[in-house]
């Protein structure tokens, strides 16, 4: 299993994402410039130049035409994927922490941080005929978060709901049409949720939390189905599209990291069985915590982005697919 090392960022990676076909891999980091890579050979196809602060989140739409990014410069930007030009730049009152396109690609949602006297807010915008006037248009929906700020977010099925993960460990489902909370999970996690990723069919999702666990939830009822336990904070988790596997990545906070930690196996990608909750493999590689993980849509490889500024693409050996639990 020989990894591809993608070196194009000067600072730590914040999020990575594949497009629907899996031929493109998008990455963003604290160095202000999101990148796009050809996932097969690791060739960098280009950068999206325009942000003035750390880029915290990104998402690409179903057709790989538009890219949305959110950053610490208090803007969320909509980009043309092919040409790298800014379609629209929407100012916000605090840093943008999460951003996602809906399944249809007609709408996008983004959330802002609770900072500088501003409450966390969730915005939904119409991006069907997006142009530079989008910055002046009123969002389709604006939901203020009075309790804990949003740290991760996903669209529910049929663009009807949004699932949000919060800094206090709560998960909630919001009705997009009414702007109201439909389901609240209560505190399934004891600490903040760092990441949330849907399964291929959207019926369940996995969360990664600072409380050292990752959990599998039902997308409609928010019932906790499985728990994957580790010893350190989990920064990211992803579900395999073809096998009953979950991959977890994390490590201590960046400020607590020492160079000796790599030997202790604190920064490995850890593979768990989706149903049996058992860890069956670890992969080394990063010199620091893993901040983001993503499975390739065909399930034959996965990518990880770390605090060391590298994106690593690992292709699985044939033995990985023959590993049957007994």
Curated annotation (Swiss-Prot):
Annotated keywords: Cytoplasm, Initiation factor, Protein biosynthesis, Repeat, WD repeat
Stated name of the protein: Eukaryotic translation initiation factor 3 subunit I
Record localization: Cytoplasm
GO biological process, one term: formation of cytoplasmic translation initiation complex
InterPro entries: eIF3i, WD40/YVTN_repeat-like_dom_sf, WD40_repeat_CS, WD40_repeat_dom_sf, WD40_rpt
Major subcellular location class: cytoplasm
WD repeat windows: 8-47, 50-89, 145-184, 188-227, 285-326
SUPFAM superfamilies, sorted: WD40 repeat-like (SSF50978)
Family under the similarity heading: Belongs to the eIF-3 subunit I family.
Assigned GO CC terms: eukaryotic 43S preinitiation complex; eukaryotic 48S preinitiation complex; eukaryotic translation initiation factor 3 complex, eIF3m
Known function: Component of the eukaryotic translation initiation factor 3 (eIF-3) complex, which is involved in protein synthesis of a specialized repertoire of mRNAs and, together with other initiation factors, stimulates binding of mRNA and methionyl-tRNAi to the 40S ribosome. The eIF-3 complex specifically targets and initiates translation of a subset of mRNAs involved in cell proliferation.
One example GO MF annotation: translation initiation factor activity
Subunit composition and interactions: Component of the eukaryotic translation initiation factor 3 (eIF-3) complex. The eIF-3 complex interacts with pix.
Gene name for this UniProt entry: eIF3i
């Amino acid at each position: 299993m020989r990894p591809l090392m993608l070196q194009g960022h000067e600072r730590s990676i914040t999020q990575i994402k594949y497009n629907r076909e899996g031929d493109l891999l998008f990455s963003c980091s604290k160095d202000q410039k999101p990148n796009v890579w050809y996932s097969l050979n690791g060739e960098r196809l280009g950068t999206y130049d325009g942000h003035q602060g750390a880029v915290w989140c990104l998402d690409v739409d179903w057709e790989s035409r538009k890219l949305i990014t959110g950053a610490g410069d208090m803007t969320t930007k909509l980009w043309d994927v092919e040409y790298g030009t800014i379609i629209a730049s929407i100012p916000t009152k605090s840093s943008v922490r999460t951003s996602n396109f809906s399944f249809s690609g007609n709408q996008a949602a983004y959330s802002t941080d609770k900072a500088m006297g501003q409450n966390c807010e969730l915005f939904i915008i119409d991006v069907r005929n997006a142009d530079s006037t989008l910055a002046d248009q009123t969002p389709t929906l604006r939901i203020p978060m009075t309790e804990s700020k949003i740290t991760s977010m996903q669209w529910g099925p049929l663009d009807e709901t949004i699932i949000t993960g919060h800094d206090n460990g709560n998960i909630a489902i919001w009705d997009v049409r009414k702007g109201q909370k439909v389901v609240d999970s209560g505190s399934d996690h004891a600490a903040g949720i760092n990441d949330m990723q849907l399964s291929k069919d959207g019926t369940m999702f996995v969360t990664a939390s600072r409380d050292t666990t990752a959990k599998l939830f039902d997308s409609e009822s928010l019932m906790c189905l499985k728990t994957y336990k580790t010893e350190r904070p989990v920064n990211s988790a992803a579900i395999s599209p073809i096998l009953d596997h979950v991959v977890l990545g994390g490590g201590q906070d960046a400020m607590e990291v020492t160079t000796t930690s790599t030997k202790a196996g604190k920064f490995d990608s850890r593979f768990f069985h989706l149903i049996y909750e058992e860890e069956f493999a670890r992969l080394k590689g990063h010199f620091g915590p893993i901040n983001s993980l993503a499975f390739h849509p065909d399930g034959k490889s996965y990518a990880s982005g770390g605090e060391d500024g590298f994106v690593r693409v690992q292709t699985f050996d044939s033995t990985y697919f023959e590993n049957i639990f007994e």
